[in-house]
């Protein structure tokens, strides 16, 4: 079974770059695929596991005691440095608060203007709808109040005009 560098790295719990570095450092002979990537077999993986174990043992050194951080920075006591920076921090903080308030105010203004425009559009639509309703009601009333015309009530069929109708039909 042949494995790629990333597969071996996952198996050993190290990065692919570490695998490549070990291959170069220890001159491990490997085959390459057509893309130039290393191909590892089980024997090589076992060798790399041994390298990892040896590297891990060599890397494990006795822990060095941690020293407390030095209280001086550039020969200036931290308290003095803190005192000199504190007014600047307060100024920046107040400016930030002011900018946040301005931003909120602008956002509120934009929303208010948008609501005003939407309200005006809605009022225009309602006015148009009311006018259309009135027009429809007036037309219905006119239709109901209109006396029936003579041509609508006659039950007699129209007499056909023979010659002129045919000639006129040709031009229509």
Swiss-Prot record:
Keyword NADP attributed: no
Biased segments, Pro residues type: 62-71
Iron is among the record's keywords: no
Keyword list, A-Z: Cell cycle, Cell division, Chromosome partition, Coiled coil, Cytoplasm, DNA-binding, Sporulation
Major localization listed first in the record, in broad terms: cytoplasm
Family per record: Belongs to the RacA family.
This protein's name: Chromosome-anchoring protein RacA
Lineage, top ranks: Bacteria, Bacillati, Bacillota, Bacilli, Bacillales
